[in-house]
């Protein structure tokens, strides 16, 4: 099993393996098998289109967690320039599960903030698997208030399984930190554009997700609990995660139907991990368009629009 492919992608993985084997045979024997390789590559593209045209919520959830999916720092590298990271909450520590700082987006100064997961074991531990502690949310809020002070729009990138549930985090006021962020973000006098680039896990996502426009990547998810967690509660078994994912309506398409998501950003065929650069440029285009829409409003119009947006949830 190719670990770069998810379980539902194994038919694609098998075709890819055949293509690689043919390439090796051709190289070793100087045979011209390019026509057969081209035929298999066309078949692979057709199969990928077929599989990805009818994905269920559980398959989307797996894609949202793909280990090679671009993370916040990848987007900062490809989308922004002159990024200057800012550290610490000025109270306790610097939470590396949240990254943020001043950058330029197409020449315009912005404050960019996002969750950051890790790829290798050491980085995963350093980033706490993308699960922020209270100091991470307080750092994010400090950066947002700085952005407001200097009239810079805020761009947030959401990708977390949720806020860290450890005892230390609870003792330092995890719920208070999240709630305070929600309250302050609702009245910041600067545009806020948020994008779910992977997992949007409950309050851990909302704490940097109160915004004027919410976008989601095509294979992102947003939910109050993971499918496995929901299945464990309802059916006492994580094996029914697929049923839970479908019932919760966690996909971008379903959330747009419910009026929660404004824009769905299409991903490359096969998912965002197939081409970080292509995905980043699509994200950049959509963020710039959203900023143009929000910066055309007066401060009073912006705040009224944000308030009405928040009050409309659940109606």
Curated annotation (Swiss-Prot):
It comes from Marinomonas sp. (strain MWYL1). PROSITE patterns: COA_CT_CTER. It is found in: Cytoplasm. Pathway: Lipid metabolism; malonyl-CoA biosynthesis; malonyl-CoA from acetyl-CoA: step 1/1. Keywords: ATP-binding, Cytoplasm, Fatty acid biosynthesis, Fatty acid metabolism, Lipid biosynthesis, Lipid metabolism, Nucleotide-binding, Transferase. One of its GO terms (biological process) is fatty acid biosynthetic process. GO terms for molecular function: acetyl-CoA carboxylase activity; ATP binding; carboxyl- or carbamoyltransferase activity. It is an enzyme of class 2 (transferase). It comes from the Bacteria. Residues 40-293 form the CoA carboxyltransferase C-terminal domain. It catalyses: N(6)-carboxybiotinyl-L-lysyl-[protein] + acetyl-CoA = N(6)-biotinyl-L-lysyl-[protein] + malonyl-CoA. InterPro entries: Acetyl_CoA_COase_a_su (IPR001095), ClpP/crotonase-like_dom_sf (IPR029045), COA_CT_C (IPR011763). Belongs to the AccA family. Its EC number is 2.1.3.15. The keyword Nucleotide-binding applies. This is Acetyl-coenzyme A carboxylase carboxyl transferase subunit alpha. The lineage of its organism: Bacteria, Pseudomonadati, Pseudomonadota, Gammaproteobacteria, Oceanospirillales. The keyword Iron-sulfur does not apply. Component of the acetyl coenzyme A carboxylase (ACC) complex. First, biotin carboxylase catalyzes the carboxylation of biotin on its carrier protein (BCCP) and then the CO(2) group is transferred by the carboxyltransferase to acetyl-CoA to form malonyl-CoA. Acetyl-CoA carboxylase is a heterohexamer composed of biotin carboxyl carrier protein (AccB), biotin carboxylase (AccC) and two subunits each of ACCase subunit alpha (AccA) and ACCase subunit beta (AccD). GO terms for cellular component: acetyl-CoA carboxylase complex.
């Amino acid at each position: 099993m190719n670990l770069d492919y998810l379980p539902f992608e194994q038919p694609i993985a098998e075709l890819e393996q055949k293509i690689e084997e043919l390439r090796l045979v051709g190289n070793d024997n100087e045979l011209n098998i390019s026509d057969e390789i081209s035929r298999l590559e066309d078949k692979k593209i057709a199969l990928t289109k077929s599989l990805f045209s009818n994905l269920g919520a559980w398959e989307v959830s797996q894609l949202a967690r793909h280990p090679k999916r671009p993370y916040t720092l990848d987007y900062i590298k490809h989308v922004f320039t002159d990024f200057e990271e800012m550290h610490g909450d000025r109270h306790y520590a610097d939470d590396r599960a949240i990254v943020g700082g001043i950058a330029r987006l197409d020449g315009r100064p912005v404050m960019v903030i996002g969750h950051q997961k890790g790829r290798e074991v050491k980085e995963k531990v350093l980033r706490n698997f993308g699960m922020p502690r209270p100091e991470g949310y307080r750092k994010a809020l400090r950066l947002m208030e700085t952005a407001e002070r200097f009239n810079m729009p805020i761009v947030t990138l959401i990708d977390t399984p949720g806020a860290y549930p450890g005892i230390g985090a609870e003792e330092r006021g995890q719920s208070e930190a999240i709630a305070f962020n929600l309250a302050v973000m609702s009245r910041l006098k600067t545009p806020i554009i948020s994008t779910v680039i992977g997992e949007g896990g409950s309050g851990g996502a909302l704490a940097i997700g109160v915004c004027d426009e919410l976008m989601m990547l095509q294979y992102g998810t947003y939910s109050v609990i993971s499918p496995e967690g929901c299945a464990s509660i309802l059916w006492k078994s994580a094996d029914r995660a697929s049923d839970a994912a479908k019932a919760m309506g966690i996909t971008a398409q379903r959330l747009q139907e419910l009026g929660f998501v404004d824009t769905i950003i299409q991903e490359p065929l096969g998912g965002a991990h197939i081409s970080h650069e292509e995905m980043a440029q699509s994200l950049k285009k959509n963020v710039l368009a959203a900023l143009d829409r929000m910066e055309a409003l007066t401060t009073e119009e912006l705040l009224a629009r944000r308030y009405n947006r928040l009050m409309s949830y659940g109606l």
